[in-house]
Amino acid sequence: MAVQLCFQEEEATVHLRRFSCKGSADCPDLSHSAGLLESFLCGTPARDYVYQSVPYETQIQQAAQAIADADCVLIGAGAGMSAAAGAQYGGDFFEKNFGEFQRKYGNDPYMQDMYSAGFYPYPNEESYWGYWSKQAVLGGIKLDVTPLHRKLLDGLSGKDIFVLSTNADGQFVKAGLPQKNIFCIQGDYFHIQCAHACHDRTYDATAMFLQMDQARRDCKIPTYMVPRCPVCGGSMDMNLRKDGYFVQDSAWYEAERCFGDFVSRSLDRKLVLLELGVGFNTPTIIRFPFEKLTREHDNITLVRLNLDQAVIPESLGNRAIGINADMAESISDILNVSVSHPYPAQER
């Protein structure tokens, strides 16, 4: 049995829907790691959130010391990390790069940024892929590695690290972190799948998106370029968790296994949960689980960086640090501050 995750944020609970994989090689039975992920995910928010009344410089010193003392670091990266690194989705960027879509479809509420435009009810598949191919190219394929991602990984060099990310831009791979150290639980901009999940496999669409980007006219791609499912002959879709048909393929389950292994071996070591730009859009994946782990294990320190949502459960005391400031500056300050090193960092 494989596990598909379905989230209902209104009730702040996590629901799991199981479906048979029919024993396919693309969807192995990983019930142990699935159980770990299920126990990790948490839909319960804290009841005692506070903005910590501690000077910024003190928080930076505390965060830097916690990371220096840690054996391992689990990074939880949300949309705020990409934004802090310079990624742009709306405003002048959207108008400049997607102005033709705004003119064609009008000043629709959907046509305000790259997030909302993905949910626009495009009239046909030529138009649908006309939009999504451009978003994939600009938001992932041609997006250079950001200095912030590179600086972060360089600053954690020598630590045992793993990244759990809800971002689709592939930045941590581009920054040099091995794929085995990354779990992109929500999918990415580089793969497509059967729109109705008739089989458990995804397909690298990088080359296809680049070709679509060149062939697009009047916001549409030629009909012959519309991808079809090689199994059922039906429509294809982005491999992004946006509905109940998200495909979790063998690579997804391998990433889940690596994540589970990292968490298991880290629970009896000094572990820092470094949460970067995670808000309340999908808090059941990173924010709430990080709080739950910190509550349950005295050896864990939570470091939460966010522009304006770095509230911390007061009950976590000095094992949680919430830095409410420009995240790029906070990361730079943490990595640059002088700290004591009680013992050498372990090799990754």
PLM features: residue spans?
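Conserved catalytic alpha/beta core of Sir2/sirtuin-type deacylases, generalized to analogous enzyme cores
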Residues: A2-R348
